[in-house]
Amino acid sequence: MAQASNENGWSDFLELCSKIKTPEAFRDFFALFLTFGERESMASRYLIIQALLADQLTQREIAKEYGVSIAQITRGSNALKAVDPEFKEFLKHSSGRYENQ
């Protein structure tokens, strides 16, 4: 029963996220639901994913540049391997970092 409840909670959470339209509202939303440490972890994961997508730095260079561990980078790399190629392209083009490439 707890598993179904968690799945419903996650679905409801994602539905709520989809209704947020501005960066300011997202900032307030995540300040409510995530601790400072969780937000820092999410920011690190974002930077790792973006660096991996850019494919310009080695994992060691990414670790040094962003102050993250090789294990964190490996987890990000493994997660990217499981992502649909279309979603990966969406991530590349949504960040604004790849517009001139």
From Swiss-Prot:
Superkingdom to which the source organism belongs: Bacteria
Keywords attached to this entry: Cytoplasm, DNA-binding, Repressor, Transcription, Transcription regulation
InterPro entries per record: Trp_repress (IPR000831), Trp_repress_bac (IPR013335), Trp_repressor/repl_initiator (IPR010921), TrpR-like_sf (IPR038116)
PANTHER family from the UniProt entry: TRP OPERON REPRESSOR
GO CC annotation: cytoplasm
Pfam families named in the record: Trp_repressor
Keyword Cytoplasm set for record: yes
DNA-binding region positions on the chain: 59-82
Main location: cytoplasm
UniProt entry tagged with the keyword Transferase: no
Gene3D superfamilies attached to this UniProt entry: TrpR-like (1.10.1270.10)
GO biological process, one term: negative regulation of DNA-templated transcription
Protein name, entry field: Trp operon repressor homolog
Compartments, as annotated in UniProt: Cytoplasm
Family: Belongs to the TrpR family.
Subunit structure as annotated in this protein's UniProt entry: Homodimer.
Underlying gene: trpR
Record's function text: This protein is an aporepressor. When complexed with L-tryptophan it binds the operator region of the trp operon and prevents the initiation of transcription.
